[in-house]
Each structure stands twice: as C-alpha cells, then as structure tokens.
C-alpha cells in the first residue's frame, strides 16, 4: 500500500523539505497527488522560508518538475513528459492562483443533548418529544469587517 496524497497546509521551511516530503507519494509507481496550501503572511515569508521556495511560489510559470530537479541535481527537461515545454497550469488544466482574499465566515455547528431515558428518541418530523432534543441550526455568517 503506497502513499496516494501528501498535503502541506503550510509552507515547508526549505525546498529540500518539500522535495523529501512530497517524494513519499507515488513511490509504488501508482498515481499520487501532492498539494500545497499556503497564505502569504508577513511573518511566514520573512524568516523561515528559503528564498528558492519563495521564488518558486511566486512564479506561476515555473514547471514543478524543473524546480524540484534544480533543488536536487539540476537535471530536468520539462517537455520530456509531454513532448513540449509546458507549465503546471497547462499540463493539468488548473488555474495556478487562488482568489486574493476569501471573506472570513463564522460558523455555528449543530449540537444535540443526549437523553438516556428508556423511551426511543423522537423521530424526525414528529412534534412529540421535540423539547427533549435541543437543536441549534447550522449557519454561516459572513464577516464584513465593518461596524
């Protein structure tokens, strides 16, 4: 059984860390995905992230394979897989950037009180027994940032 998915939910400190961690996926020769999610916070970008990693993330035209190879041994030809030079966005048909700033939202989650009585729990849609179960509906309220 091999690793099918590697997810980074923050920036690795170095490009070598990224290479090592994403290299775990697909070692058995089967299809695998490596996903990197990050936000550009000043504190994140200022201290611990290497310049090569910053340059890679800022350049939407750089081939991922080329970057990884340049960090290892420097040998890579991007078009060796496709027969022509290509970027990540054209290879996989994805848009390489995310929307600027998503609006934050406050979510409330449903909660149910447990009742350890001998009677069965109330059935959905029935009016009897509804007082025994306290429900709060799930809602999402956008935060506008204005008061």
From Swiss-Prot:
Residues 1-72 form the Helicase C-terminal domain. It comes from the Eukaryota. Residues 100-147 are annotated as: Disordered. Gene3D superfamilies: P-loop containing nucleotide triphosphate hydrolases. Residues 125-141 have a biased composition (Low complexity). Belongs to the helicase family. RecQ subfamily. Truncated ATP-dependent 3'-5' DNA helicase. This is Truncated RecQ DNA helicase-like protein C212.06c. It comes from Schizosaccharomyces pombe (strain 972 / ATCC 24843).
């Amino acid at each position: 059984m091999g690793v099918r998915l590697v997810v980074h939910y923050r920036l690795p400190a170095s490009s070598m860390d990224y290479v090592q961690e994403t290299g775990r996926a697909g070692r058995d020769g089967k299809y695998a995905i490596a996903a990197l999610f990050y936000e550009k916070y000043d504190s994140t970008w200022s201290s611990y992230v290497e310049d090569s990693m910053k340059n890679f993330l800022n350049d939407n035209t750089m081939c991922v394979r080329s970057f990884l190879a340049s960090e290892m041994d420097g040998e890579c030809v991007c078009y060796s897989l496709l027969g022509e030079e290509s970027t990540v966005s054209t290879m996989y048909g994805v848009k390489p950037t995310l929307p600027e700033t998503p609006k934050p939202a406050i979510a409330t989650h449903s909660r149910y009180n447990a009742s350890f009585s001998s009677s069965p729990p109330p059935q959905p849609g029935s009016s009897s027994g509804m007082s025994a179960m306290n429900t709060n509906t799930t809602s999402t309220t956008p935060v506008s940032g204005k008061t």
